[in-house]
């Protein structure tokens, strides 16, 4: 029996909750949001769909964090959404304050919960939440970029997506790093089957398509929600899938979250970072340095703001 809490049930939160619940991953689901009536009305919607499917999941919608208790997994989507032309880092201060508040309120009533950060900038928010909560936290990281990578290569080379393997690592978003040594099509290295498809084109797609989707559709939802559901599924059923999610590491004395391919199950790890070739590790190390520099600048400003 797995109890899962969904913190923030706006557009992406609703899609994630639907995906998780209808994959049979939660025996009980708690839907929380600050918007009056939203969790309650979303609860009704889900109950109608659950009845149609004949599931037994119990759903509770609430505007009170006091009702979020004894959850096994807590997914955090609460935060301001990314708007067209806005980078994920632009969101840092406002959304970090939300995570600090949640970090103070959630842990006392949810001992042993696994926290999965979804709110952007997702890796930095995971680092902020873990810093203030002292609870093990992961972020969805580059799991989404990884599937964008595979899907684009599959489309361009006209092969099924399940015939493409490979991972994206580093920070989620514009600074993500494609681990080209891991990219294979039908088991063959990318370079052998590229047929004129360049690495630059693939990388540009992976980094630019989210902004294009946001510009036209107002947000990315279905791709991320399905991938996040897969992360939850691998944890709940201890599947041990290798996924590129962001896990905590200490760098320059600060906890930061960086994505690397890692085994995801009831326990998180080990990672495959140690078996990557030097070329990939160098690019990943630079991503870590860049992430830390920007995160530390934002964190220092945040701490001054919080003190005020």
UniProtKB/Swiss-Prot annotation:
Binding site for NAD(+): 8-13, 33, 95, 118-120
Keyword Nucleus annotated: no
Any single biological process term in GO: pyruvate metabolic process
Pfam families in the cross-refs: Ldh_1_C (PF02866), Ldh_1_N (PF00056)
Molecular-function GO terms, alphabetical: L-lactate dehydrogenase activity; L-malate dehydrogenase (NAD+) activity
Key words, A-Z: NAD, Oxidoreductase, Tricarboxylic acid cycle
UniProt signal peptide: none
Catalyzed reactions per annotation: (S)-malate + NAD(+) = oxaloacetate + NADH + H(+)
Record: active site: 172
CDD domains per UniProt: LDH_like
Positions of substrate binding: 82, 88, 120, 148
Top EC category: oxidoreductase
General function of this protein: Catalyzes the reversible oxidation of malate to oxaloacetate.
Family: Belongs to the LDH/MDH superfamily.
Protein name: Malate dehydrogenase
Gene from which the chain derives: mdh
């Amino acid at each position: 029996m797995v109890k899962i809490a969904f913190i923030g049930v706006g557009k992406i939160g609703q899609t994630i909750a639907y995906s998780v619940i209808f994959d049979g991953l939660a025996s009980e689901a708690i839907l929380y949001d600050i918007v009056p009536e939203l969790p309650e009305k979303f609860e009704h919607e889900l109950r109608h769909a659950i009845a149609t499917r004949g599931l037994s999941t119990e759903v509770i919608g609430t505007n009170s964090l006091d009702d979020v208790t004894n959850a096994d997994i807590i997914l955090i989507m609460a935060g301001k959404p990314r708007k067209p032309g806005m980078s994920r880092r632009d969101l840092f201060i406002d959304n970090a304050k939300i995570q600090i508040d949640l970090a103070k309120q959630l842990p006392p009533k949810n001992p042993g919960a696994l926290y999965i950060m979804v709110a952007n900038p997702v890796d930095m928010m995971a680092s902020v939440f873990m810093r203030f909560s002292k609870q093990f936290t992961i972020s969805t990281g580059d799991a989404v970029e990884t599937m964008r990578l595979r899907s684009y290569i599959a489309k361009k080379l006209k092969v099924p997506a399940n015939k493409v393997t490979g991972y994206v690592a580093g920070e989620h978003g514009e600074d993500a790093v494609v681990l080209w040594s891991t990219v294979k099509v039908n088991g063959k290295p990318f370079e052998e089957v590229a047929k004129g498809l360049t690495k630059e084109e693939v990388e540009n797609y992976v980094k630019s398509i989210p902004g294009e989707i946001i510009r036209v559709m107002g947000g990315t939802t279905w791709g991320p929600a399905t991938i996040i559901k897969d992360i939850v599924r691998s944890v709940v059923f201890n599947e041990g899938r290798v996924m590129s999610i962001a896990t905590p590491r200490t760098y320059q004395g600060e906890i930061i979250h960086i994505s690397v391919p890692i085994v995801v199950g009831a326990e998180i790890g080990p990672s495959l970072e140690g078996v990557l070739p030097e070329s990939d590790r160098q690019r990943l190390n630079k991503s870590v340095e860049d992430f830390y520099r920007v995160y530390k600048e934002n964190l220092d400003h945040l701490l001054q703001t919080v003190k005020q």
